[in-house]
Regions:
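Loop/turn elements at helix/coil->beta-strand transitions in domains of secreted/extracellular proteins
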Residues: 23-29, 42-47, 87-93, 162-167, ...
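A cross-domain feature marking catalytic cores of carbohydrate-active enzymes
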Residues: 34, 48-50, 96-98, 169-172, ...
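Active-site-adjacent substrate/metal-binding segments within catalytic domains
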Residues: 1-40, 56-90, 133-145, 221
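Flexible loop/turn segments at secondary-structure boundaries
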Residues: 37-39, 55, 100-104, 174-178, ...
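Short, hinge-like loop/turn segments at secondary-structure boundaries
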Residues: 48-49, 64-65, 184-187
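Aromatic- and acidic-residue-enriched segments that line the glycan-binding/catalytic groove
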Residues: 40-54, 89, 96-132
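Glycoside hydrolase catalytic-domain groove-lining segments
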Residues: 141, 145-156, 160-222
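Short, compositionally biased "basic patch" segments
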Residues: 1, 121-130, 146-150, 155
């Protein structure tokens, strides 16, 4: 349809039309995962997602941070992500992930790891449970410890490869999921607390509590 409307240069002309509409509607920021043809016009502020940096479906959105080679691979992937935009003044920052699937399912994730292939995170978990006991609470503690280690590694890499822009967090699925420990980890790792909201409005009481614990500005991703 765009080709039929605009002809061969339809991408550029459609991008121009989008910017005109945003101006008319009073919108000043492009949404996450908008078309890069529009980003590259450099006429509206925008946000980028970090892509393909190593999150694993097998680990419900974590990485095996106990693998000696994983941080190097992740760092190289982040460097590739930010190379084009690290000096772009229109970029606000990066979402480093989206809706971690393991939150509130830490026990299940530990079972997946223990029943899965031999790998460093499995060995680390086995040793941790042997020392601390195998309970739902100790399993949750291990996953939180792993998540914190991963978030700090990503934050360090992002600041090294692009010190000019913000780490906008991991777009938690629901602010209601976030206990005080996750808020503390977020405070130590992110420049903003991002979450998605599928209700008509977010829970203001939960937002106030999140602000009290994390001290971070908040952004609703979707």
């Amino acid at each position: 349809n765009l080709y039929r409307r605009y002809g061969k240069n339809y991408l550029d002309r459609a991008a121009e039309m989008t910017i005109k509409r945003m101006d008319k509607w009073g919108l000043n920021t492009l949404a996450n995962r908008s078309d890069k043809t529009i980003y590259d016009k450099n006429r509206k502020a925008f946000i980028l997602p970090l892509e393909n940096i190593g999150f694993e479906n097998e680990l419900m959105g974590l990485m095996d941070v106990y693998d000696n080679g994983i941080e190097k691979k992740m760092d190289e992937a982040i460097a590739r992500n930010v190379a084009k935009y690290k000096n772009n003044h229109w970029l606000i920052g990066y979402f480093i992930g989206n809706e971690p699937a393991w939150i509130s399912k830490e026990n299940r994730l530990c079972s997946l790891i223990l029943n899965g292939k031999d790998r460093p995170i499995k060995t680390e978990l086995q040793n941790f449970l042997k020392e601390s006991g195998d309970t739902p609470d100790t399993r949750k503690t291990f996953i939180y410890k792993t998540f914190e280690k991963l978030m700090k590694a990503i934050s360090k890499s992002l600041k090294k490869n692009d010190p000019n822009h913000l780490n906008l967090g991991i777009r938690y699925g629901y602010i209601e999921q976030l206990d005080d420990e996750l808020l503390r980890i977020s405070k130590e790792s992110f420049d903003a607390l991002s979450f998605n909201c599928y209700a008509l409005s977010p829970d203001h009481e939960k937002m106030n509590h999140a602000l009290e614990i994390s001290g971070l500005p908040m952004i609703i991703g979707e």
